[in-house]
Amino acid sequence: MLVLKLTGRIFDEEDLVAKYAAIIRRIGGKVAVVTGGGEVARRYIAMARKGGASNTFQDLLGIYASRLNALLLISLIGDDAYPKAPSTVEEFLDAWRRHRVVVAGGFQPGQSTATVAALVAEAAGASVLLNAANIDAVYDDDPRRNPNARKIPTLTYDELERILKTSVVPGGYELVDPWSISILRRNCVTTYIFDGRRPEYVEEILRGGNPGSKITC
Protein backbone atom coordinates (compact mmCIF):
# COMPACT_ATOMS: atom_id res chain seq x y z
CA MET A 1 0.00 0.00 0.00
CA LEU A 2 1.28 3.45 -0.94
CA VAL A 3 -0.03 6.96 -0.29
CA LEU A 4 1.49 9.60 -2.56
CA LYS A 5 1.05 13.38 -2.22
CA LEU A 6 1.85 15.30 -5.41
CA THR A 7 2.52 19.02 -5.28
CA GLY A 8 0.36 20.87 -7.78
CA ARG A 9 3.50 22.19 -9.43
CA ILE A 10 4.00 18.76 -10.99
CA PHE A 11 0.93 19.47 -13.13
CA ASP A 12 2.63 22.52 -14.58
CA GLU A 13 4.90 20.12 -16.51
CA GLU A 14 3.21 17.65 -18.85
CA ASP A 15 6.03 15.10 -18.90
CA LEU A 16 6.12 14.84 -15.10
CA VAL A 17 2.43 13.95 -14.90
CA ALA A 18 2.92 11.18 -17.48
CA LYS A 19 5.94 9.82 -15.60
CA TYR A 20 4.06 9.63 -12.31
CA ALA A 21 1.15 7.89 -14.04
CA ALA A 22 3.55 5.32 -15.50
CA ILE A 23 5.12 4.66 -12.09
CA ILE A 24 1.71 4.22 -10.46
CA ARG A 25 0.72 1.74 -13.18
CA ARG A 26 4.01 -0.12 -12.78
CA ILE A 27 4.21 -0.58 -9.02
CA GLY A 28 2.17 -3.32 -7.42
CA GLY A 29 -0.44 -3.03 -4.69
CA LYS A 30 -2.92 -0.34 -3.82
CA VAL A 31 -2.03 3.32 -4.35
CA ALA A 32 -3.79 6.42 -3.03
CA VAL A 33 -2.78 9.78 -4.51
CA VAL A 34 -3.61 13.34 -3.42
CA THR A 35 -2.94 16.16 -5.89
CA GLY A 36 -2.40 19.86 -5.35
CA GLY A 37 -3.85 22.63 -7.49
CA GLY A 38 -0.71 24.01 -9.14
CA GLU A 39 -0.62 27.00 -11.46
CA VAL A 40 -4.32 26.72 -12.33
CA ALA A 41 -5.25 27.15 -8.67
CA ARG A 42 -2.81 30.00 -8.13
CA ARG A 43 -4.02 31.90 -11.19
CA TYR A 44 -7.72 31.49 -10.44
CA ILE A 45 -7.29 32.34 -6.76
CA ALA A 46 -5.32 35.47 -7.65
CA MET A 47 -8.04 36.64 -10.03
CA ALA A 48 -10.78 35.91 -7.49
CA ARG A 49 -8.90 37.71 -4.73
CA LYS A 50 -8.40 40.74 -6.97
CA GLY A 51 -12.12 40.74 -7.68
CA GLY A 52 -13.00 40.67 -3.99
CA ALA A 53 -14.07 37.03 -3.62
CA SER A 54 -14.26 35.62 -0.10
CA ASN A 55 -11.56 33.34 1.30
CA THR A 56 -14.02 30.45 1.20
CA PHE A 57 -14.69 30.98 -2.50
CA GLN A 58 -10.96 31.23 -3.16
CA ASP A 59 -10.51 27.91 -1.34
CA LEU A 60 -13.21 26.36 -3.50
CA LEU A 61 -11.39 27.43 -6.65
CA GLY A 62 -8.24 25.77 -5.33
CA ILE A 63 -10.16 22.60 -4.51
CA TYR A 64 -11.69 22.33 -7.97
CA ALA A 65 -8.30 22.98 -9.58
CA SER A 66 -6.78 20.16 -7.53
CA ARG A 67 -9.62 17.84 -8.56
CA LEU A 68 -9.05 18.76 -12.21
CA ASN A 69 -5.42 17.69 -11.76
CA ALA A 70 -6.62 14.49 -10.11
CA LEU A 71 -8.87 13.73 -13.09
CA LEU A 72 -5.98 14.28 -15.49
CA LEU A 73 -3.86 11.78 -13.58
CA ILE A 74 -6.78 9.33 -13.43
CA SER A 75 -7.14 9.53 -17.22
CA LEU A 76 -3.44 8.69 -17.66
CA ILE A 77 -3.47 5.80 -15.19
CA GLY A 78 -6.39 4.11 -16.91
CA ASP A 79 -8.64 1.27 -15.78
CA ASP A 80 -6.84 0.60 -12.50
CA ALA A 81 -8.01 3.96 -11.16
CA TYR A 82 -11.36 4.96 -9.69
CA PRO A 83 -12.80 7.22 -12.42
CA LYS A 84 -13.70 10.14 -10.12
CA ALA A 85 -11.85 12.35 -7.64
CA PRO A 86 -13.43 11.67 -4.21
CA SER A 87 -14.66 14.78 -2.42
CA THR A 88 -14.87 13.32 1.12
CA VAL A 89 -13.09 10.74 3.26
CA GLU A 90 -16.21 8.58 3.08
CA GLU A 91 -16.19 8.60 -0.72
CA PHE A 92 -12.47 7.85 -0.70
CA LEU A 93 -13.00 4.81 1.52
CA ASP A 94 -15.82 3.49 -0.65
CA ALA A 95 -13.63 3.80 -3.76
CA TRP A 96 -10.61 2.37 -1.91
CA ARG A 97 -12.48 -0.85 -1.20
CA ARG A 98 -13.21 -1.40 -4.88
CA HIS A 99 -10.22 -0.03 -6.82
CA ARG A 100 -6.45 -0.47 -6.81
CA VAL A 101 -5.78 3.25 -7.36
CA VAL A 102 -7.75 6.22 -5.99
CA VAL A 103 -6.75 9.81 -6.81
CA ALA A 104 -8.17 12.73 -4.83
CA GLY A 105 -7.75 16.49 -4.78
CA GLY A 106 -8.97 18.83 -2.06
CA PHE A 107 -11.89 17.98 0.21
CA GLN A 108 -13.21 21.17 1.83
CA PRO A 109 -12.45 24.89 2.27
CA GLY A 110 -9.86 25.78 4.87
CA GLN A 111 -8.12 22.42 4.51
CA SER A 112 -4.83 21.97 2.66
CA THR A 113 -4.13 19.03 0.36
CA ALA A 114 -1.34 18.14 2.82
CA THR A 115 -4.06 17.56 5.40
CA VAL A 116 -6.13 15.61 2.87
CA ALA A 117 -3.11 13.35 2.25
CA ALA A 118 -2.76 12.78 6.00
CA LEU A 119 -6.48 11.96 6.31
CA VAL A 120 -6.24 9.57 3.37
CA ALA A 121 -3.22 7.84 4.92
CA GLU A 122 -5.13 7.50 8.19
CA ALA A 123 -8.28 6.19 6.51
CA ALA A 124 -6.34 3.68 4.41
CA GLY A 125 -4.30 2.48 7.39
CA ALA A 126 -1.05 3.35 5.62
CA SER A 127 2.26 3.32 7.47
CA VAL A 128 4.12 5.43 4.90
CA LEU A 129 3.34 8.66 3.02
CA LEU A 130 5.48 9.86 0.11
CA ASN A 131 5.34 13.63 -0.41
CA ALA A 132 6.55 14.75 -3.85
CA ALA A 133 7.15 18.36 -2.87
CA ASN A 134 8.19 21.63 -4.46
CA ILE A 135 11.54 21.43 -2.65
CA ASP A 136 13.91 18.49 -2.31
CA ALA A 137 13.93 17.97 1.47
CA VAL A 138 13.23 19.51 4.86
CA TYR A 139 15.62 22.30 5.84
CA ASP A 140 16.19 24.14 9.10
CA ASP A 141 15.01 27.30 7.31
CA ASP A 142 13.31 28.10 4.01
CA PRO A 143 16.07 27.43 1.43
CA ARG A 144 14.48 29.83 -1.03
CA ARG A 145 14.98 32.67 1.42
CA ASN A 146 18.13 31.51 3.18
CA PRO A 147 20.96 30.11 1.00
CA ASN A 148 22.66 28.79 4.14
CA ALA A 149 19.68 26.64 5.17
CA ARG A 150 20.77 23.15 6.23
CA LYS A 151 19.20 19.98 4.81
CA ILE A 152 17.90 17.55 7.44
CA PRO A 153 17.87 13.91 6.22
CA THR A 154 15.97 12.46 9.21
CA LEU A 155 13.83 14.12 11.87
CA THR A 156 10.75 13.62 14.02
CA TYR A 157 7.37 15.32 13.73
CA ASP A 158 8.13 17.25 16.92
CA GLU A 159 11.33 18.58 15.35
CA LEU A 160 9.51 19.45 12.12
CA GLU A 161 6.84 21.30 14.07
CA ARG A 162 9.49 23.40 15.82
CA ILE A 163 11.09 24.28 12.46
CA LEU A 164 7.76 25.35 11.00
CA LYS A 165 6.95 27.49 14.05
CA THR A 166 10.27 29.31 14.24
CA SER A 167 11.69 29.55 10.73
CA VAL A 168 8.98 29.73 8.15
CA VAL A 169 6.87 32.51 6.70
CA PRO A 170 3.26 31.22 6.59
CA GLY A 171 2.37 30.01 3.13
CA GLY A 172 5.94 30.19 1.92
CA TYR A 173 7.25 26.71 2.66
CA GLU A 174 4.76 24.22 1.26
CA LEU A 175 5.47 20.91 2.95
CA VAL A 176 2.99 20.15 5.71
CA ASP A 177 0.88 22.14 8.14
CA PRO A 178 -0.02 21.70 11.82
CA TRP A 179 -3.18 19.72 11.04
CA SER A 180 -1.38 17.24 8.82
CA ILE A 181 1.46 16.85 11.35
CA SER A 182 -1.06 16.08 14.09
CA ILE A 183 -2.80 13.41 11.99
CA LEU A 184 0.42 11.77 10.80
CA ARG A 185 1.97 11.79 14.28
CA ARG A 186 -1.06 10.25 16.01
CA ASN A 187 -0.99 7.40 13.47
CA CYS A 188 2.82 7.11 13.49
CA VAL A 189 2.94 7.41 9.68
CA THR A 190 6.47 7.75 8.30
CA THR A 191 6.66 10.58 5.73
CA TYR A 192 9.27 10.93 3.02
CA ILE A 193 9.76 14.41 1.53
CA PHE A 194 11.46 14.46 -1.87
CA ASP A 195 11.86 16.61 -4.97
CA GLY A 196 8.64 16.31 -6.99
CA ARG A 197 10.59 16.95 -10.19
CA ARG A 198 12.24 13.53 -9.73
CA PRO A 199 9.47 10.91 -10.07
CA GLU A 200 12.05 8.12 -10.07
CA TYR A 201 12.53 8.82 -6.37
CA VAL A 202 9.22 7.05 -5.66
CA GLU A 203 10.75 3.71 -6.59
CA GLU A 204 14.03 4.60 -4.87
CA ILE A 205 12.16 5.13 -1.61
CA LEU A 206 10.26 1.88 -2.07
CA ARG A 207 13.65 0.15 -2.38
CA GLY A 208 14.70 1.60 0.98
CA GLY A 209 16.38 4.84 -0.09
CA ASN A 210 15.94 8.34 1.30
CA PRO A 211 16.66 10.93 -1.41
CA GLY A 212 15.20 13.78 0.63
CA SER A 213 14.02 13.74 4.25
CA LYS A 214 12.44 11.02 6.36
CA ILE A 215 10.06 12.11 9.13
CA THR A 216 9.11 9.69 11.90
CA CYS A 217 7.03 9.81 15.06
From Swiss-Prot:
InterPro entries from the UniProt entry: AceGlu_kinase-like_sf (IPR036393), Asp/Glu/Uridylate_kinase (IPR001048), Uridylate_kinase (IPR011817), Uridylate_kinase_arch/spir (IPR011818)
Positions annotated to bind ATP: 5-9, 38, 42, 134, 139, 142
The protein's Enzyme Commission number: 2.7.4.22
Predominant localisation class: cytoplasm
GO molecular function, one term: ATP binding
Any one GO cellular component localisation term in the record: cytoplasm
Subcellular location: Cytoplasm
Regulation: Inhibited by UTP.
Pfam families listed in its UniProt record: AA_kinase
Any GO BP annotation: 'de novo' CTP biosynthetic process
Annotated metabolic or biological route of this protein: Pyrimidine metabolism; CTP biosynthesis via de novo pathway; UDP from UMP (UMPK route): step 1/1
Matching SUPFAM superfamilies: Carbamate kinase-like
Catalytic activity: UMP + ATP = UDP + ADP
Gene3D superfamilies on file: Acetylglutamate kinase-like
Residues where UMP binds: 37, 59, 107-113
Keyword list, A-Z: ATP-binding, Cytoplasm, Kinase, Nucleotide-binding, Pyrimidine biosynthesis, Transferase
Function according to Swiss-Prot or TrEMBL: Catalyzes the reversible phosphorylation of UMP to UDP.
Family: Belongs to the UMP kinase family.
Subunit composition and interactions: Homohexamer.
Protein name: Uridylate kinase
Lineage: Archaea, Thermoproteota, Thermoprotei, Thermoproteales, Thermoproteaceae
